[in-house]
């Protein structure tokens, strides 16, 4: 983490501004004097203010954080003044007269950054023009001067430090915001130094027990680990010196959050982690990086599955480094990162590196890297002009800032950065609108893949096109999974808007009629509310907009429900569930044969389905001979069976499903979704269409996260039916995950 300096505290325990400024490492005397004047101005403006101490110290913290990034003097002055401006102690107009336009513009840009919260707050709601304008201003401020973003990140770190001793709910609130918003933003901009501190503080507040456990493990083995790394580094230095490779070699600290995340992701214990012992090699030149890699792999056996060359294939945020894991002395794993000095600075500072090298001979290279990092933002500003739906614009910003990324290759080897979960059509529309419109197929590594294929990291994709554009309206259906990005959907919407207006009107009428019939509302009644709501003069304009995809159907339906006092979501769900449970479905060719399980070697011994895992036909099964209750039939992957096997392996018997049995089996399916009106109705409609009996439903809502969790006990006849049902449930709008519970 970034350490808080104490050099500015004198012997009497008082703040000494001269010592403080000297501790910041500012080389220009003029800049030091300028910062001293700004500090004096802050003292003057906060005199008598009840929160003077808090505001001043927050500014000091922000300046210290930013000084580790070697930010320029205007950035440091803006950081020192920002807490005062944000608390309305002094207005921007007054500041402009006192400290100048350039510093105030930075402060104004930092205040515009508050709009980033609306990207999370409005994810499932309708959006106002004011919210969209706020986000547009934020994007423009970020592109115009990226220092405002870095200042905002420093302000959030300062806040996390402040709440260390605050009540738990205050710490958790601050940590959740930074986890959801600011840490992903720091990562997207490549500012590793700030990203790690944000993540470690958030992890400490949100998971205090896990944080303390890992911190304790690191501390307990610190001396042994440091001694091991010292010897390992000494050997590498000697070998590279002998080969004439110029590079620094040193052990590097591990961040607690990254350790925990890897333990969770790979289901590893602390002792099984590769990178608790970590070394970094920082070389002078690129060729020295690969020479160093050769030396490492010559003297130590490497693990091929843990090798990544991010120099040849940089991460979407511009990160470059070679990662390898080797078996060191004693068979202990050591993770090694190899990079040039420029790559190291870029990895730690990200966009902030541009300001460090803005002046002088290095400016050109730094500027190029800076431009690469904000290219996605410039595209966002250009794309927003094409997006008629303001909600789509916000969706695209959310995707670019918060979503995980995947990078793939064109046939020529160019890297394309897309949101994780993107499809071949998303790729095609990213390349060019015309490529997407004319797309009829795609190949990954020379193999044809379906349009619903989710692109994987490193895929090389080729788009197959026809002469004439012919996109399908089905591509806009979110349940089918053809197009997942707002960028792609916007391009398709635009194409249909330009086509025959009559076709859009007919399609819109069909869509609207279906929804109105379901709601029990006539078209004339709906017109009176919809025309003014969407600023249309006649119904044909409205229908054309619906058919062309310009109006979001779920928002329109929610609006009509509120206008006509239709049943609440709870009432609709209860009615749908009651109607479904009144029906009982059975397979048409149900067998009367009760030989549901064949257990090898035990004849017709009584058997029953184990409640712990509730296997169904299609699951691989195993029998366990109980005492007095015959044979219990378990799924082969049942955790309880594994326990039984370890204690009494002689009681385990092979079992298979009988060919003629078709009775129903009960199990529990859990659906997690964004809470919305009509969610349970949509889910139960699918179950009814699939003729699945619902035996019970339990649901709960998380109002803070706006999530609904629904556990349904259903009767299923085989694994194929279950797979089909889960597939359709996962395609319901707003459903995040639908799966069979492990114990069912």
UniProtKB/Swiss-Prot annotation:
Its EC number is 2.7.6.5. Residues 668-743 form the ACT domain. Disruption phenotype: A slight increase in biofilm formation in a csrA-disrupted background; when combined with a spoT disruption (a ppGpp0 mutant) there is a very large increase in biofilm formation. The ppGpp0 mutant makes decreased levels of CsrA and its inhibitory small RNAs (sRNA) CsrB and CsrC. Deletion of relA alone decreases persister cell formation in a hipA7 mutant; the double relA/spoT deletion obviates persister cell formation. Residues 404-465 form the TGS domain. One of its GO terms (biological process) is nucleobase-containing small molecule interconversion. Signal peptide: none annotated. Pathway: Purine metabolism; ppGpp biosynthesis; ppGpp from GTP: step 1/2. It catalyses: GTP + ATP = guanosine 3'-diphosphate 5'-triphosphate + AMP. In eubacteria ppGpp (guanosine 3'-diphosphate 5'-diphosphate) is a mediator of the stringent response which coordinates a variety of cellular activities in response to changes in nutritional abundance. This enzyme catalyzes the formation of pppGpp which is then hydrolyzed to form ppGpp. The second messengers ppGpp and c-di-GMP together control biofilm formation in response to translational stress; ppGpp represses biofilm formation while c-di-GMP induces it. SMART domains: RelA_SpoT (SM00954). CDD domains: ACT_RelA-SpoT, NT_Rel-Spo_like, TGS_RSH. PROSITE patterns: ACT, HD, TGS. The keyword Kinase applies. One of its GO terms (molecular function) is ATP binding. The lineage of its organism: Bacteria, Pseudomonadati, Pseudomonadota, Gammaproteobacteria, Enterobacterales. The keyword Ion transport does not apply. Keywords: ATP-binding, GTP-binding, Kinase, Nucleotide-binding, Transferase. Residues 55-160 form the HD domain. It is an enzyme of class 2 (transferase). Pfam families: ACT_4, HD_4, RelA_AH_RIS, RelA_SpoT, TGS. This is GTP pyrophosphokinase. Belongs to the RelA/SpoT family.
